[in-house]
Amino acid sequence: MLDDFKIDLLVKNKPPTSTTAVVAMSGGVDSSVAAALLHKLGYKVIGITLQLYNNNNNSNTKGACCGSLDTQDAKQVASSMGFPHYTLNYEKVFREEVIEDFIDTYTQGKTPIPCIKCNQVIKFRDLLNATKSLGADVLVTGHYIRKIEQDDDIYVYSSKDTKKDQSYFLFATTVEQLRLLRFPLGNFHKEDIRKLAKYFNLQVANKPDSQNICFVTDTYKKTIAELRPHTIKKGNIIDINGNILSQHNGIVNFTIGQRKGIGISSKAPLYVIKLNPDTNEVTVGPKSALLQNKLYIREINWLAKEKIPHNGLNVKVKLRSSHSGSPATIFPNNNNTATILLQDSYCTVTPGQACVIYDHDRMLGGGWIC
């Protein structure tokens, strides 16, 4: 069966038996298979799991990742396959750099993506440091994404399994980080990975995919209320003309484009159009008021060697992880920002989300929507 899972050498011109690979193990099936496959192919595998929170007493965190229960799963996989595994406790750093940022973003009237922030400031930054300190050659993850190196240039592509592609969540990964990163699952489909997990007799073979924000045990609103209750303040719900329609119990309860749960009866459907943290107001209106064909992005991470020309570059952009992509033109601005002109108007351009930029299936980079 292993003949169906051929991968390129992790390090060019270096045999597996001479290559040490740190594998970031979340406790899920993908990273477990990545580690097991490399071990079977003869690589010197070291499994590392970052424990980001404790879910021992909370069954609601099933479907998440990187908790104490997931650490146990990763450790069991390593033990059954016969390679070393280490757990690094990152609960404090995770709280300070991801959870606090998550709450800050919501209280600013934006909608965060903590998974990208976690990859950016913890998983890749700190795991890469651990990889270097161990003297390992590469850091391997179970992400569904493809990377090709040619003549010292790096090209990143969507996964062959388009339903599982995770390139959107990795837009903030830098070129220097990518030089040490390897993604052996990018050329395979999820169903094949589960078959391989069963072939290796991994206990996580049927473990559900992570779908939730790992540290949110119920709803994100409840999490914010528990961790920072003083930020939840009542305010007005207004229409697009400024007329007061009702009151709300905190802008963190809303996101741009939301229709359900607004709490206002109306003949025509109402959507959340704007969140104003300064006035603590929620603006609602018809769906047509959500349509936009221009947006701005900041903190751009540009992976392509070619710079964005001043007269613009025609691209495809994804404004949500589930978005199939829209044709657009990107124009560079000062201070690592850019303007995006969409070919067609798009609903729910949401501040705080990521705008990831592609040339067909090649990821060029991305930035945060202002």
UniProtKB/Swiss-Prot annotation:
Q: Where does ATP bind?
A: A24, M25, S26, G27, G28, V29, D30, S31, L50, G142
Active site residues of this protein = C118, C214
- Chief localization: cytoplasm
Q: What class of enzyme is it?
A: transferase
Q: Which CDD domains match?
A: MnmA_TRMU-like (cd01998)
Keywords from UniProt, A to Z, are: ATP-binding, Cytoplasm, Disulfide bond, Nucleotide-binding, RNA-binding, Transferase, tRNA processing, tRNA-binding
- What EC number(s) is this enzyme filed under? 2.8.1.13
Q: Where do the TM regions start and end? A: none
**Chemical reaction(s) catalysed:** S-sulfanyl-L-cysteinyl-[protein] + uridine(34) in tRNA + AH2 + ATP = 2-thiouridine(34) in tRNA + L-cysteinyl-[protein] + A + AMP + diphosphate + H(+)
What name does the UniProt record give this protein? Answer: tRNA-specific 2-thiouridylase MnmA
- Source species, please? Ehrlichia ruminantium (strain Welgevonden)
